[in-house]
Structures are given as structure tokens and as C-alpha cells.
Amino acid sequence: MAPITLSTVDDDLKEVIQHLFEIQSAVHGYLGPETQTELVRKIKNLTLALSTLSTHTKPQPPSQDEEQKEKQDDTPEGSANDPLLRDIQLPPEIIDYVDAARNPDIYTREFVELVQRGNQDLKGKKEAFASFRDVLAREMRSAMPECRGEVERVLAATGGARVDTEQ
């Protein structure tokens, strides 16, 4: 069986949605026994579509033959635009958001804001340590002139402010 791609599952979902819409329309226009066979047919089609979707989304470990083939081929089976279903990893938090009928974009926005706050904290710490490094180097140069060369070497290695050694 060929590997299942995201577009295959997407098509299966669209088909299920289409069948549900058709059933909704048939139920809305139900006229009795004369439309019953059509409704039964549409329900059977929905059942088949759901069965296909279920089959396509079952996790299937790759067989040894497929693993050997993947090792031999340098090209991936799925393209960047249509990845294999088994390669898609969703964070459990996003799944929880969807299960709770919340918008996953809210999770993404909150996550980005959290990362930005963390980056700002780290930037502040980096600047504080750089300032401390420069103050410490200046004080060490003035207090221990014999260590001036080592201080300059450490400053150069850590990206600190360089001071002329000829004074």
C-alpha cells in the first residue's frame, strides 16, 4: 500500500463533508417512502467514506521493505507541499485547544508572545553580563596592569569593547 499523504486525507475529509451535506439536504427535503431509498444510499456512501478515512488515518508502521527502500532512495516519498501523514507531528496542546472548541490560532499567538517575553529576558541578561564584563575588565586593567594582555585576550574572545593598550 502506498504511503498516505496529507492531500489524500484532506480529500477524504472533503468527501465526508460533502456526504454529510447531501444527507442534510435529503433529510430537509424528505417526502416519505419515495425519497427513503435515496437517503439510505447517501448514508451508505457516508459510511464508505468514513471507513476510507479511518483506514487512511490508522497509524501503520513502515514495513522492513519500505524502510530499506527509504534508506536506498535519497528522495523523500512526500513532497514539501504534500507531506506524508506519518511525518506530521502536532503538539498535544493544539489538539487540546481544538477539542475544547477553541481556535488553535490563539494557542499560536500565546506561544509566540511567551517566546518573545523569554527572548526579551534573555536579551536583558546578555546585555547585563556584557556590561559587567566590560566593567570587570576595566577594573582589572587598572588594578592589575600585569594582567592587561590576558584581559584584552578575553575581551577579544567574548566580543567586548577593545581599549588601546598604549597608555
Swiss-Prot record:
Record organism: Neosartorya fischeri (strain ATCC 1020 / DSM 3700 / CBS 544.65 / FGSC A1164 / JCM 1740 / NRRL 181 / WB 181)
Keywords, sorted A to Z: Activator, Nucleus, Transcription, Transcription regulation
Protein name: Mediator of RNA polymerase II transcription subunit 10
Presence of keyword Transcription regulation: yes
Family: Belongs to the Mediator complex subunit 10 family.
Pfam families hit by this protein: Med10 (PF09748)
Function in brief: Component of the Mediator complex, a coactivator involved in the regulated transcription of nearly all RNA polymerase II-dependent genes. Mediator functions as a bridge to convey information from gene-specific regulatory proteins to the basal RNA polymerase II transcription machinery. Mediator is recruited to promoters by direct interactions with regulatory proteins and serves as a scaffold for the assembly of a functional preinitiation complex with RNA polymerase II and the general transcription factors.
Domain of life: Eukaryota
Main location: nucleus
MF terms (GO), sorted A to Z: transcription coregulator activity
UniProt keyword annotation of Transcription regulation present: yes
The protein's assembly and partners: Component of the Mediator complex.
UniProt-listed GO biological process terms: regulation of transcription by RNA polymerase II
Protein location: Nucleus
